[in-house]
Amino acid sequence: VKRTALALAALLLAGTAIPATAADAPSKAPPSGDFAVTNVTVAIGDGSAPIRGGAVVVRGGRIVAAGKDVAVPAELPVIDGTGKWVTPGLVSAMTDLGLVDVGAVEESNDSYAGTARFSAGLDVSLAIDNDAPPVAVSRASGITRAGVAPIAANAIFAGQGAVIDLAQNGPDAVQPRAFQLVELGERGADLAGGSRVAAQALLRNALREARELAQRKPGKDTEGLTLGQPSDALLSRADAAALIPVVTGKQPLFVHVERAADIRGVLALGREFPALRLVIVGAGEGWRVANEIAAAKVPVLASALADLPGSFETLAATQSNVGRMTAAGVKVALGGFYDNDQPRYAPQFAGNLVGLSRVPGATGLSWGQALAAITSIPAEILGGGSTFGSLKPGFVADMVLWDGDPLEISTGAVTIFIDGKPQSLVNHQSRLRQRYRYPKESGLPKAYE
């Protein structure tokens, strides 16, 4: 993988997320969901190496076969993939897609509720706008499904995230209330009153109150709003009811921590609340406790480029973090893409980890592992491990056809399918590029005259 001057490349990409060959027009492909792609390099997304000269067969919007020596039925329309690569649609497990239109405009930002009376009870699926410009930008870059999470504002619990597909004119929320997000570490300490001790006490008390509420009304989860809370309860009825799926194991608990000691504290939660389905978000020092994370079978959403200490809780940060955790047996997905349309950088970050594997003394990922970190592993974390994120038979046909190696910085998406249906690559950025690529003199008066 050709990777040099990574920091400079990241800056250059900020304004040119979509290559000039893409996003000029909707994809030209069979709309029926029944087709085949042949003579293409196939990347399944399960960690295996890419397969050259392969094919993919799709029927009814689902994968029938993918790989080498695949029999293509004669009656199917065929897309010639000569010189191209095909991968599963990219999956980003932690974003604010659909919650923010313009980051600098407060009125268009629903990711942060600074004065809300609720915390765990917040449900972002009710505010997601699939027509928000960052959604189209991310789709044109190969993102087909994403987790959408709120940002913790005035309590350690941020609220309930959703899983969406990015199909044009598609449903806003595929899976509402897909996970709960809680802040610990330095941010959680600040929200809890100034210390990690307070944050841990608040978290454990909240989980106990939710467990007690569930025991008083068996079989109820977020519908338990009609139940009263004890007079000494710290949580509102709505927040306690929203945590019942967490303590009963029906909803994953995403916990944002960075420091090794804080990660150990998260793993200890499982001893008191054995039904918890934990996911660690951040884990900047995860490599220091990688064996413990692997033994607990807790997946991680981590940044690929966190190689410098940005705070006291990331003093041991290293760009080898993801590679070391993966080598220890931890399932690691690349995630945490906030700031509007930044999920588009996922292939670049994954490619950086491939390049890192060639740096003496560093630990990166193989090509197959890197692709899995932005496809099948985040899909599994979001609960779609048997549905999307791979080109295995039976999976939905979320596919991206690329004009080269998708982990190369200069490669762009050519055709994108979600559920086997071709998607438009047109977005606000591509329209601006087309408008000003070849500017023409207009007969209208200048605005400054």
Label every model-predicted segment.
Residues 7-17:
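Bacterial N-terminal signal peptides
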Residues 40, 44, 54, 380, ...:
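C-terminal cap of metal-dependent C-N hydrolases
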Residues 27-30, 42, 46-87:
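Histidine-rich, glycine-flanked metal-binding segment
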Residues 102, 109-115, 120-121, 252, ...:
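His/Asp/Glu-enriched, well-ordered alpha-helical/loop segment
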Residues 131-134, 139-277, 412, 418, ...:
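Polyanionic/metal-chelating signatures
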Residues 19-27:
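Boundary at the C-terminal end of the N-terminal hydrophobic targeting segment
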Residues 23-24, 32, 340, 415-449:
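Extracellular/periplasmic ectodomains of large secreted or surface enzymes and adhesion receptors
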